[in-house]
A protein has these predicted regions:
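Beta-strand-rich interaction surfaces with strong enrichment in secreted/lumenal proteins
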Residues: 68-71
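Short proline/glycine-enriched turn/loop motifs at strand-loop junctions of beta-rich domains
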Residues: 56-62
Length: 151
């Protein structure tokens, strides 16, 4: 059995000058094992003043945000774009993406730019198996959040 440091360590590039290693959090997203996708996806301010926008879109060939193309993280279905410090960006930016199959362009917003909608009490009761109206919390609950209808 491997220790947790070995399991969570990012993979190394097998060949010098080969494709870059994929970070551990992005690899966990790709494999569906990340416990908190909000940690990686969405809009994140960086210490140097830049902003990173990151999405996971397995159905997309290409993705654009804030008027520019996002780069695919090699070997994954994650796309990201780093915006310069001081760049104007909507809190919930519109994503434009091209479908892999048909090539059609669509637009949407990333759900990971919105705050989590399940409260602590609901999570606690659900975890205990004592939430007797969980259908009011989970699933498709049509709402308007931050002025955006249909969230």
């Amino acid at each position: 059995m491997r220790d947790s440091q070995t399991v969570n360590a990012p993979p190394k590039s097998p060949v010098a000058g080969g494709p870059p290693a994929i970070s551990a959090p992005i690899m966990r997203l790709q494999t569906g094992t990340h416990h908190d996708p909000f940690e990686v996806l969405g809009v994140h301010a960086q210490a140097d003043g830049t902003t990173v926008v990151r999405v996971f879109m397995p159905q997309a060939e290409a993705v654009e945000v804030a008027g520019g193309r996002m780069a695919r993280v090699a070997g994954t279905d994650c796309f990201e774009r780093v915006l310069a410090a001081g760049s104007a960006l909507d809190v919930h930016p519109v994503l434009k993406w091209q479908d892999k199959r048909a090539g059609d362009w669509h637009q949407d917003r990333s759900p990971y730019t919105f705050a989590a909608q399940i409260g602590e009490v609901d999570l606690h009761l659900f975890g205990e198996g004592r939430h007797f109206q969980i259908w009011n919390v989970l699933g498709a609950q049509l709402r308007t959040i931050d002025g955006i209808a249909g969230c």
